[in-house]
Amino acid sequence: MPLLVLHLFAAAQNKKQLVSAKKYNTVVSKETMEQVFDEIKTPHKYGIVFKHPDANKLMDSPTIFKKNGVWYMTYIVFDGKGYETWMAESKDLLHWKSLGKILSFSKDSWDANQKAGYMSLVDIDWGGSYKVEKFQNKYWMSYLGGNTIGYEAGVLGVGMAYNSTLTKPVEWQTATTPILQPKDIDARWFENKTIYKSTVIRDKEKHTSHPFVMYYNAKGDTAKYESIGMAVSDDMVSWKRYGASPVITKYKGICGDAQIVKINKLYVMFYFGAFWKPGAFERFACSYDLVNWTDWDGEDLIKSSTDDDETYAHKPWVIKWKGVVYHFYNAVGKSGRVIALATSKDLQTK
């Protein structure tokens, strides 16, 4: 292609991006942020809704979706060796039954001892179907992977698993190499040490010019804190990083475990914070374009206040169903590491 044509093409692309960017506000107003808080807040702690059948194992990171009138949860379990991924089911969001493992330890692979999975392409519409979308006739699940034994030990990266069925407790297929890892040549300053939890959504509006968007928390070799960054894809297999900086960071402690929902035309990111003030707690941010996020500066959505979450109250999955907001989170306290629930209405009162 002649040099002049290349320059003209690049200019056209830049102009297209600028025109697209002008369609959306990059900052969400304080009034709107307060309205969102009023919509999503869950002041009533229901308590523990799920313990792993083996109480000696630690559970974490719920992802909840629905199929054929039944609710399902993927969650991860740490047994002293590493993470594996399990599935549970419920008819009412309050009582859960474990179904079995879907990502297990393996041998001689990059992810042999760590497979912490998070279901991809869950419907993000607030009060929506919460169904999981198929792409190329497969269901997809990103996961934290690594081959070192221990709690989030060694070099961790993001893998992608897939399966033809969604709700059966069968082993999912995994790729032989990670899709993102901290040693990648294009790894950014805030992620070149370790990459942790990820979440993948379909961006129907293509705000980034790509249909699939991933958010993940990561730590850098000099940035010794966790921030949330972005990556994009056209096919769920090949991913490229998006932007030069994290979309959410406090430059200390942890910002992590993002979940994205869409309330009308506004995107809401639930995430947890830790150690940039005491404890671990649930927060949120808002965006009109999935790229520019306004962080909430008010009170926590969830914080430690009971025996069951006295140590940590963190790692959100939030849905609205039949007029009630359900905020699932990982509670760490006197009952161990379990899944707890807070709601917008008091479900304990009959």
Language-model-detected regions and their locations in the chain:
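Extracellular glycan/ECM-engagement signal in secreted proteins
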Residues: 316
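Bacterial Sec-dependent N-terminal signal peptides
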Residues: 1-15
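Beta-rich carbohydrate-recognition and catalytic domains
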Residues: 13-117, 121-197, 201-256, 261-311, ...
